[in-house]
Amino acid sequence: MSPKRRRHRTRDTEHVARHEEEVGLGVGSAAQRYAAYKAEAQAASSLRARWVSTLSFTPDPFQIQALDAVEAGSSVLVAAPTGAGKTIVGQFGAYVALEQGMRAFYTTPIKALSNQKYLELCDLYGSDNVGLATGDTSVNSGAPVVVMTTEVLRNMIYAGAPLDDLGVVILDEVHYLADKMRGPVWEEVIIHLPAHVAIIALSATVSNAEEFGAWIREVRSSCEIIVSEKRPVPLYQHMIVGEDIFDLYAPTGKGKLNPELVAATRDSEMRGGRGSR
């Protein structure tokens, strides 16, 4: 075949392919449409879809990614600013465990936060399904979902407590692992939990999230790392000088101190004021 005839044949083939694509008859188009339909049907019937339908808001992309990872049974590390919505990932983990007939442990670093999460989960799943176990309080500790301090879970592991029916552990405020005094507790829990237990680690934004997630993946065999730096709730910083409150930074100029604050501080120092804080 001459080069000229080959070029004509190529142009004709491309024209037919474009026409078939436009009318939906291209190679693989039927398979692609079926695959898309099947994926949509599966998504609509998923636990995630049912959970999301109960929410009063539309989850952000990072939340959807985390929910899908949880439903797939993978461990997941979610690092996002305070107020970004990490909590619903932990709540969904408890929901999945309940739907699958497994137990879920929701751990926090302090008793006050455990009490708060206990009340939140009671509102979601009913007090019959939620328990509380801290150092000095035990409420319905045999419930399918139990809120506890991380130390309580560590002690359960070392005491050989039966965990065969435990499906997931939510580690709230997992960035405490970097704490010199209490960090080893989180480390021991992550390392010594039974292999079948998935971990949902919720953390404030940290600089080494990828490294942290890689370590969890190393000791737990799987971990999806999801990082969001979007702060939906604005963070404002102020300073009080005497009886007045000032914005810490100028409205324009990133990182530049508020000139009114600087002037007020100097004036206070000149007058020997000691009221700045």
Residue ranges and their predicted role:
Residues V139, E173-L177, N208:
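Residues immediately C-terminal
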Residues T82, I110, M148-V152, E173, ...:
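A short beta-strand-to-loop transition that corresponds to the Sensor-1 phosphate-sensing loop
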Residues V146, T150-E151, A159-A201:
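SF2 helicase catalytic motif II
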Residues M102-N155, A214-R217, E224:
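Conserved nucleic-acid-binding Ia/Ib motif block in the N-terminal RecA-like helicase ATPase lobe
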Residues V70, V96-Q100, D123-Y125, T137-S141, ...:
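Conserved catalytic network of the ASCE P-loop NTPase/AAA+ motor domain
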Residues A79-T82, V89-Q116, P194-H196:
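Conserved SF1/SF2 helicase motif Ia
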Residues M1-D68, A72-S75, P234, K254-L257, ...:
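Helicase-associated low-complexity/disordered flanking segments
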Residues I191, A198-I200, T205-R277:
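Conserved interdomain linker/interface between the two RecA-like ATPase lobes of SF2 helicase motors
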